[in-house]
């Protein structure tokens, strides 16, 4: 269980760090959200494929 939850908790921690650092730069926040959403989609797809298999 802990291994499956960690991929979801880590992006939240990274998002908190990037949000604080990106407040001064609007572009940084946009890029962070863009990459974060791609990362979350990949993690979610990988998580679903693991459940299916």
Curated annotation (Swiss-Prot):
InterPro entries: DUF478 (IPR007429). It comes from the Eukaryota. Keywords: Kinetoplast, Mitochondrion. Its main location: mitochondrion. It is found in: Mitochondrion matrix, Kinetoplast. The keyword Mitochondrion applies. GO terms for cellular component: kinetoplast. It comes from Trypanosoma brucei brucei. This is Uncharacterized kinetoplast minicircle 201 polypeptide. It holds the Pfam family DUF478.
